[in-house]
Amino acid sequence: GYAPLNAPSRTGVYVGGSPTEHALAAGTDPALAASIGALQVRILTDREFLAPWISYRLGLDGPSMTVQTACSTSLTAVHLAVQALLLGECDAALAGGVAIGTVRRQGYVHYQGGIFSPDGRCRPFDEKAAGTVPGSGVGVLVLRRLEDALADGDPVRAVIRGTAVTNDGAGKVGFTAPGVDQQTAAITEAWAAAGLEPSAAQYVEAHGTGTELGDRIELEAAGTAFAGGTDGRGAGHRGSGSRIGIGSVKSNIGHADAAAG
């Protein structure tokens, strides 16, 4: 790791966060506003200031962007950071998301037809899947170009071979539902950007909310993308009996909203 003052030059910050009850409570607290001022309360609690505040506190002088794409925020932040590194806009980057539930005005609420499971358990891709559960978490990656990391002797935990971003537009059954076509395109484009074929895959970490609608659509999109591949052959030419695992960490930590990527 790096101490803030020893961070690589031009370190960018690409992060996003979920709205919190704490921010709402602090923003409407007249005593707090009287103590430090309404503007300071907003700066310290409003998620739009997250990236520049981190850059300021750590003394990082690269691009600083607060990203907001709902549940895909943290993964979109990683994509933007990767692109910035490849374009030479920064030499290192912090990328990720945060969702922390602190002050709760009510307990766990389930209602018929909603996204939350009736028993408070999330079971992605399971026959008993009936919904997701809210979760809290922070996920941040320190990203560098591989050649720079190796040259400086940095520990390399993983290599990002390729990323892609798409958007469903109106091509889905509802605003909060995923769409098959653009999810398929995102997977295919990511494989192409990585210069790899689906046959190389051993495991897929999916969004996997544990909802009947979302899991089914995600499985269909992954199946379509893996069947086609980038060479038209797909994962099927791995050989008969081959399998690709699929799962989601939400079964352990729940849906972390802006940090779910």
Enumerate the predicted regions with their spans.
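Condensing-enzyme catalytic core of the thiolase-fold
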Residues: G1-G261
